[in-house]
């Protein structure tokens, strides 16, 4: 990684901004519209601050902040069955939201890809580690796709819509 002239990877300003956005995302994650029994919920757009930060600061900051957010989610609302599942469901899944930072000029594509990445990490975890929760006769792949897709599709639509509003109102451009 390239260090700045001060010998740091991130400036104090970017670290402070990252902490604020992760904190905001965490607070929003507590405002649940619906929660599922093995983890996952529809929230008050808790992914938006992380996606916005990724779009604002690019992939390096976005991936870092999103991974930190995943670790914070692990600490505050853990659902643990296996160490590999923990990695997939927290730092990897949430970390993939930072992919949005690669698409600063196409925010809706970036947000869609970040959320899709998160879905695939949760989906894989569901197939491998949560198959025992699938009702009898339902293949684990179908179960995981419906379980994870059900809440992430709604959460994703909410997030994409809010990012669209921020983009349409030029708020994203003001803060980039």
Please place each PLM-identified region on the residue numbering.
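Juxtamembrane/transmembrane-helix interface segments of polytopic membrane transporters
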Residues: 25, 29, 122, 126-130, ...
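Internal alpha-helical transmembrane segments of multi-pass membrane proteins
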Residues: 103-120
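Hydrophobic transmembrane alpha-helices
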Residues: 1-55, 60-64
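Interfacial aromatic-anchored transmembrane helix boundaries in multi-pass membrane proteins
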Residues: 28-42, 68-101, 126-135
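Structural signal for the C-terminal ends of transmembrane alpha-helices
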Residues: 55-57, 99-104, 166-171
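Alpha-helical transmembrane segments and their cytosolic interface
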Residues: 1-22, 108, 142-176
């Amino acid at each position: 990684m390239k260090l700045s002239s001060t010998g740091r990877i991130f400036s104090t300003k970017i670290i402070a901004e990252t902490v604020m956005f992760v904190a905001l995302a965490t607070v929003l994650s507590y405002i649940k519209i619906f929660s599922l029994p093995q983890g996952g919920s529809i929230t008050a757009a808790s992914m938006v601050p992380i996606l916005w930060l990724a779009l604002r600061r690019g992939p390096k900051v976005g991936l870092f902040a999103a991974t930190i957010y995943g670790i914070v989610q692990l600490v505050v609302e853990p659902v643990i069955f296996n160490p590999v599942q923990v990695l997939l469901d927290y730092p990897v899944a949430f970390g993939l939201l930072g992919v949005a930072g690669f698409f600063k000029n196409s925010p809706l594509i970036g947000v869609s890809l970040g959320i899709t990445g998160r879905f695939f990490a949760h989906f894989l975890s569901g197939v491998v580690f949560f198959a025992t929760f699938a009702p009898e006769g339902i293949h684990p792949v179908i179960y995981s796709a419906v379980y994870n897709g059900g809440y992430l599709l709604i959460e994703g639509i909410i997030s994409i819509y809010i990012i669209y509003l921020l983009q349409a109102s030029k708020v994203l451009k003001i803060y980039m």
